[in-house]
Amino acid sequence: RYPGAFEPMDAAYDDQGRPQAYLIYALLVCATKDGRWLQFAQVSPKLIGAWLTELDLLGELADPKWQGFPMLPTPELRTEWWDMMIERVGARTLAEWQHAMTENLDLSGELFRTPEDSLNHPQTAHEGRATTVIDPDLGPVRQPSTLIHADGKPLTQLRPAPRVGEHNDSVAFDQVGGAALPAPQGDHHDPPLKGVAVLEFGSMFAGPYGATLLADLGARVIKVEPLEGDNIRNLVAFPEAGGAKVLQGKESVAIDFTKPAGLDLVYELAKRSDIVLQCFRGKAAERAKIDEASLRAVNPDLAFVTTSGYGVDGPFAHRAAYAPSVGAASGLARVDSHDTGQPPTDLDDLHRRAVKLHAGGAVPAVQSDGIAAHGVGSALLVALYAKRRGKMLTNVVTTMLGTVQQAMIAYNASYASRPAETPADEQFFGMNALYRMYRAADGYVFLAAPLPREWPALAKAMSPYADLHADERFADADSRTAHDEELIAALTPVFAAKTKLEWENELCAQDVGCVEVVEANSELVLQSDPYYEAGYAVDAHSPIFDEHRRLAPLCRFSRSRTRADAGCTIGQHTDAVLSEIGLDEAAIADLRVREIVGGG
């Protein structure tokens, strides 16, 4: 509907390392007085106000110079404000900042940890989300516990990985525990979750997108929003664009449930729901009387999943969590930034390191919000499945931090004989000569032939351009490892001689893994015409954006279809949903006048 009205920013910093995106200030990366790196998390209006107050910068906004903050017009002004914040943070030690975050509940920040050290996080220790498994070959293995916790402990006791065929004699493959499931009624086209009603309380992305995944599978998801709407709707400069993805397929009901009449409406919705997703910090849901106990009092058959950044209790439960802060706490940012977390030597060095650490926690395709949301979707399905099998789970909890630690298990699991990780090179081209990017004539290709059995095909394919077979430095896997830099040097001019698609076509035809590198956001690529025609993207109709493309649902089924709807406006479905629970037009109008409901 609005072509050209909004162009997403490619990077948070410009080519000179100066801030471009206003969220840099809310999500400040900075070093303390004693050289420890912190990732702050102050995105909502309330939190950014608390942040500027803590830094004693709120009064500065009275100066006309800063008009329009945080969207300052020039790189010079943006950098000047950035440096003011850096100076204020750098005036305190890590211990002083940790004390401030304990005293000020609207202040949140995380130390940039390694993946292994992430399992020492105070909240991880409090919840028991790190455990030790005794492996018969490796000995004690320290690793994350289960993705889902129930009743304050891991959903199941972790066991060592089984040996091949270890349980062949002990498993009766024709027996299934629990209640028998109904047999499929032939071919049909209903979505797999048709008839499931999800009631969602949450904001932003990491929790709510878990319910979006269920909407794609056919669940009816009713999102209860405050009258002013979820903050994510206005997170980017173009109104509603920030929430377009997370609101897909949902019905929005705007209710002020801080008022008794609004809370009564919530209880009526709970009576008609199968499962609730609650995404509030700490004990906020309990204070609002929409916690598990309160809602099960009106519907005992209600499945319930609680998710937040850090859990329902413990030292960090009250803190806000956003993708960058959880990326710092989990070790994700350190792995993807190559920064060792060393103290900065001067302001220029601080700028450079801050940009790298930010980039490590903000890779669009793999960042903490998306990882956590898939954990939430999994927990919702587990809770629904358990309910269907006649076992109602209670106090089902996932956390952003715990879920991202699960995704980092290849990096955070530790045991005595664990080999050292092979890091990517400094420029992030790849891991070694046979698993990395190379510059082609018109861009880059990625070569993926790291296994010894793949070498003969690669050497043969390259024989018109370089005689790799005859070079003793590359005779076997050990030699190639010892002469990795020389192998890179041998292949670099070869790849530079042809275009990326020429290399992809030529090498793939000879069973050598090689693809062109597309230098664009993966979601934009997957919505381009070739991928749209292949089914990776579909058309949806939004009340805000009209017809547009969106990514297709993640799953496809042999007998069931999925849904791929667009988002909704604030309270778009308020009237329709309230009518379903028995309210007439006059009653709804009265609630709107009293500012108990909105939208419609």
Where are the regions that the model predicts?
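N-terminal helix-loop segment corresponding to the beta1-alpha1 unit
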Residues: 95-97, 133-134, 159, 163-392, ...
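Ordered, small/hydrophobic-rich secondary-structure cores
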Residues: 21, 46-87, 91-155, 460, ...
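Alpha-to-beta junction loops
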Residues: 103-109, 219-222, 272, 300-302, ...
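Aromatic-enriched alpha-helical interface/lid elements that frame and gate functional surfaces
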Residues: 26-105, 434-510, 514
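Terminal low-complexity tails and localization/encapsulation signals of metabolic enzymes
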Residues: 12-16, 31-33, 84, 113-200, ...
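Conserved beta-strand scaffold positions in the cores of enzyme catalytic domains, especially
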Residues: 109, 252-254, 304, 395-397, ...
